[in-house]
Amino acid sequence: MKRTYQPHGTPRKRTHGFRVRMKTKNGRKVINARRAKGRKRLAV
């Protein structure tokens, strides 16, 4: 049986990348929340 997670860099970056997050107000909210929490990785 084929597994559900078949990782590929491009689609991943396109949907969850930093630049995509910065495009919308809520995306920026996500980045700021992760900054405040002290996350090492802000986006993908």
UniProtKB/Swiss-Prot annotation:
One of its GO terms (biological process) is translation. Gene3D superfamilies: 1.10.287.3980. One of its GO terms (cellular component) is ribosome. InterPro entries: Ribosomal_bL34, Ribosomal_bL34_CS. GO terms for molecular function: structural constituent of ribosome. Keywords: Ribonucleoprotein, Ribosomal protein. The keyword Ribonucleoprotein applies. It comes from the Bacteria. HAMAP family: Ribosomal_bL34. Belongs to the bacterial ribosomal protein bL34 family. This is Large ribosomal subunit protein bL34. It comes from Campylobacter jejuni subsp. jejuni serotype O:2 (strain ATCC 700819 / NCTC 11168). The lineage of its organism: Bacteria, Pseudomonadati, Campylobacterota, Epsilonproteobacteria, Campylobacterales. The gene is rpmH.
